[in-house]
Swiss-Prot record:
Protein name as catalogued: 26S proteasome non-ATPase regulatory subunit 4
Pfam families assigned to the protein according to its UniProt record, in alphabetical order: UIM (PF02809), VWA_2 (PF13519)
Basic and acidic residues bias: start-end ranges: 225-240, 381-396
Region (Disordered) residue spans: 225-278, 311-341, 360-396
Biased composition (Gly residues): 249-262
């Protein structure tokens, strides 16, 4: 495994707004940078990758690091603007590589070019010769079919490699092609031995991610796919009315039943079982969220007496069992005598002149000092005195 520090140059000029590479050049370039970054970091755990932009004033977004998340977060903040400045970008990338921490790392620059180059071929060739002396390899990904770009870039790569060198590469991606697929089969990913991109293809691991190397990313992708599947199933259930037969089911008549094989029967049984479990789950959720509205009275239409009676009934239902057993143990004579005592108490209260006087004072529109009220209260006092005299004579 080769120890290598790599600077990736991101073309973010206004030409990256074009949609000739679906959905836009900028987005497919991000996919290609993701692929290159993961390839370099997985080939050796000590490798480092940096990121910089090429438009207008060249900017270094991330210095050399082994944290792929940092590269991805910086890359997604890039917006297209201005024109590409390829020559300045390559010089600054070389300066960043010269200040790498691992001096035993080989130096490599990966440049994405999707804009017309405004530099002369001679200037780029001179820069290529300087990079060759410093033992810096450059890989260029050219896309967009801009005039003489390929001729200028080919001369640049040939000056880097010399007669026998093969360390630098040029990959041209024509319109209509997928940039990441072209990179997968290129020497930039595969390497000189053709084994650099092992494990990055979508057919090797699920979602194109090795769970042994990045278990968190693999788990996140798996959970995301499961949530998407559940969301699609719920949308299909909402689209189909309740009780409607599934498409292509029993609507085919008897011929469809006779022609179905064991596999179809097993799939139909599995679907019925899933539907049954789903129905039971929905029923349980409905029961758990259901409120007993039918058992609750309408307090708005109840009188005060009805509300008091309902409150007393609820308090009796909430009372402990001991009070119920104590009431059951009471003799029947007490129950028979209780209403009489209540009646006697009520008669005594009604016949109390002081109580009547207080009630009359609180009644609206009643003058307790009027002659009629005084006569009524006085008659009650006379009746009370007569009753008390009669009781005293009976006792004697």
């Amino acid at each position: 495994m080769v120890l290598e520090s790599t600077m990736i140059c991101f073309d973010n000029s206004d030409f990256q707004r074009n949609g000739d590479y679906f959905p836009t050049r900028l987005i497919v370039q991000r996919d290609g940078i993701n692929l290159v970054c993961l390839t370099k970091l997985r080939s050796n755990p000590e490798n480092n990758v940096g990121l910089m932009t090429l438009s207008n004033t060249v900017e270094v977004l991330a210095t050399l690091t082994s944290d792929a998340g940092r590269i991805f977060s910086k890359m997604h903040l890039v917006q297209p603007k201005g024109e590409i400045n390829l020559l300045t970008g390559i010089r600054i990338a070389h300066l960043v590589l010269k200040h790498r921490q691992g001096k035993n790392h080989k130096m490599r620059i990966v440049v994405f070019v999707g804009s017309p180059i405004n530099h002369e071929e001679g200037d780029l060739v001179k820069q290529a010769k300087r990079l060759k002396k410093e033992k810096v390899n450059v890989d260029i990904v050219s896309f967009g079919d801009h005039g003489n770009n390929n001729e200028i870039l080919t001369a640049f790569i040939n000056a880097l490699n010399g007669k026998d060198g093969t360390g630098s590469h040029l990959v041209s991606v024509p319109r209509g092609s997928v940039l990441s697929d072209a990179l997968l089969s290129s020497p930039i990913i595969q390497g000189e031995d053709g084994m650099g991109g092992a494990g990055l293809g979508g057919n090797v691991f699920e979602f194109g991610v090795d769970p042994n190397e990045d278990p968190e990313l693999a788990l996140a992708l798996r959970v995301s796919m499961e949530e998407q599947r559940q969301r699609q199933e719920s949308e299909q259930r909402r689209a189909n009315p309740d009780g409607a037969p599934p498409t292509g089911g029993d609507a085919g008549g008897g011929g469809g039943v006779s022609g179905s094989g064991p596999g179809n029967e097993e799939s139909a049984g599995a679907e019925n079982e899933a539907n049954t479990e789903e129905a039971m789950l929905q029923r349980a959720l409905a029961l758990s969220t259901e409120t007993p509205e039918d058992n609750l009275p309408d307090f708005a239409n109840m009188t005060e007496e009805e509300q008091i009676a309902f409150a007393m009934q609820m308090s009796m239902q909430d009372a402990p069992d001991d009070s119920v057993t104590q009431q059951a143990k009471r003799p029947k004579t007490d129950e028979a005598n209780a209403p009489m005592d209540v009646d006697e108490d009520y008669s005594e209260v009604i016949g109390d002149p002081a109580f009547l006087q207080s009630v009359l004072e609180n009644l609206p529109g009643v003058d307790p000092q009027s002659e009629a009220v005084r006569d009524a209260v006085g008659s009650l006092n006379k009746d009370k005195d007569k009753k008390s005299d009669g009781k005293d004579s009976q006792k004697k």
